[in-house]
């Protein structure tokens, strides 16, 4: 039997996720993002990014907390090869304090928050990000697992 894969499943996928470094404040929330790569010229109308956090509580049958992070509008015509970088921060903050990477060509930058006060840091180790189509089908999923920060070597005082 042939493997059947509907076209919806090949339109886009999660490319990468970049959680904010520890110690980042809300003002720096734009440094945290997730990238979605478009693989087919198509319409991503009502596709959404979902954030899930496992709560690991025995008393809860399905110990998961979730929220919608970003929704593509309707219609949302996209081209193959486009990369959407969805920042956790604010569009207003980006306009007034652009990060050097925001000015680089080749990515479409979108923001979860409009006003600066609505920005938040959301991605922590062990969270999941899902790309969900308009019908609620999970198209792609990624686990947030940033590299651990390496401790800085301590300098030993010179002996005389």
Outline where the language-model segments fall:
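Solvent-exposed beta-edge/loop recognition patches
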Residues: 65-160
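Eukaryotic short linear interaction motifs
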Residues: 43-44, 56-58, 93-94, 138-139
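A short linear-motif detector with a strong N-terminal bias
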Residues: 12-15, 27-30, 62-65, 106-110
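Short aromatic-acidic-glycine turn motif
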Residues: 53-66
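A structural motif detector for short, solvent-exposed N-terminal "entry" segments of globular domains
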Residues: 1-55, 117-125, 143-160
